[in-house]
Design a protein with these regions (language model features):
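Membrane-interface helix-loop junctions in multi-pass transporters/channels
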Residues: 1-127
Length: 127
């Protein structure tokens, strides 16, 4: 199977997971803040950090599998465009503090999650 098709399949899986989170998060946490978008970006950043470190530092994840997991599944799971849309919606409603919070929380937490993913992978490898 071609790498292109594998990435497409991975993207479909990631997108399906994102959709499930998007319909579940408002029921669990309400609609005052886009918790679903924050959650998929946070988890995706953590997993991407771990996947890339494990794939580059070891032979545990082959280059093809790394491509499927990172570009496919994590690419489909995470969503920068939804972050932008939700932030612009806050701005159009005059909720500037929520717009700012959305940007700062996402960027800060996702950077931390990515670093935690790499650190966790290093810990698993004992390095």
């Amino acid at each position: 199977m071609s790498r292109f098709l594998l990435v497409c399949i991975g993207g479909a899986i990631g997108t399906g997971i994102r959709y499930l989170v998007a319909i579940t998060a408002p029921r669990l946490f309400g609609t005052a803040f886009p918790y679903g978008t924050l959650a998929v970006n946070f988890v995706g950043s953590f997993l991407l950090g771990a996947i890339l470190h494990l794939g580059l530092a070891t032979t545990l994840i082959s280059p093809t599998m790394r491509l499927v997991l990172a570009s496919g599944i994590m690419g489909g799971l995470t969503t920068y465009s939804t972050l932008n849309y939700e932030t612009l919606e806050y701005v159009s409603q005059g909720a500037f503090w929520l717009a700012g919070l959305n940007i700062v929380a996402t960027v800060t937490l996702c950077l931390l999650a990515g670093a935690l993913g790499v650190t966790s992978a290093r810990w698993l490898l004992g390095s």
